[in-house]
């Protein structure tokens, strides 16, 4: 099995050594030959399932279904489309150059349960004009500061990756970490760890996120005060944990100032600072299937790995997954045995940056190597391959993005984490059985709202 993993990795590596783009672009190309965030505006000139269309502005409220009112569940703007292709274990060999290593292993491991329905591609990414303007400015001012990013606020810092392969990889990773996901969003969502026999239990939370980095009132890094975002979550289920709460102060430069986290215990009615919520710390609600830095495909300081850019490639990845959050689909139908139900999943051909991190000598992490596939338009990591200490592929992570046109922003509607060795998986971001999805319509609170004192008040409600 290890030899198969290494062989597949070698084949993918060889296929990616020739990037599909030149790196001679500059900031003046943003909004011209490049999209406002740095993707190639042109399509690939191919047809059928291989076609990548030109970017023409994305999916905004003006083009969205007219019957939508935020924060309702989004109707699928592509509901009338049918798959152009189905990739499964029997035919995957002829499409392997378009598949991530992890997806290939999922197909091999679950030949009766997993397949990809490949639809026409739509480049739906749209962002507010101010984010586009800030990104153009950041293209000339942002720079790496060791493992950190400096010189940018309110935009994508490195829309045109440049420099060495290591520099480009770190810049792409920072684009993912700082990508636009609104300013203040709230939602009620569930997560579940699905066991080998298909059983699961839901953990449900009320969540609030304030992306201070994108607050239009914050104009300078000094005003930002090294805060990327605040995250507050109050547990609703299961009953034994109800009333507990978590607050995270996510810093931009975590080597200079590590993230801070606090937990409120409803039974003890006490707020305590968490000693460690980073790197490979296991997440309790994930039943050991997700580390702290697995969340959002990757988060936190990138300093435990040596990063390199492998290249840019056209690949079949999850995209425009409106069906996965449809209220017509119940959790019991979505959370199927072995893998997340593939029927409502939508896969499309898109260009992705492929970067790889190898654990640095003397550093500790349960993953010896990580490979990320980053959407060129949104800078969202859409797939991740995680390797164990022996060098064998261990876990496969998939993000299922869609455009939230009312903001507008692109974010994953849910994330799934598959353990190929334990034959279990974890899903977070479930909203199908909730009355609403993300609500980005509420006024933005200030820093004082996200304090340990406020955490206790939220937890006891």
Give the ranges of each region predicted by the language model:
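Sterically constrained small-residue positions within well-ordered secondary structures
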Residues: 5, 15, 78, 224, ...
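Long, C-terminal catalytic modules of enzymes
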Residues: 433-461
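Solvent-exposed N-terminal domain segments of exported/luminal and surface proteins
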Residues: 27, 31-258, 265
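Bacterial N-terminal signal peptides that target proteins for export
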Residues: 1-10
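Bacterial N-terminal signal peptides
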Residues: 9-19
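Extended beta-strand-rich segments in extracellular/periplasmic secretory proteins, especially
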Residues: 175, 189-239, 295-372, 382
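Gly/Pro-enriched, hydrophobic low-complexity segments
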Residues: 27-57, 100, 232-302, 337-443
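Signal peptide processing junction and immediate N-terminal pro/mature segment
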Residues: 20-24
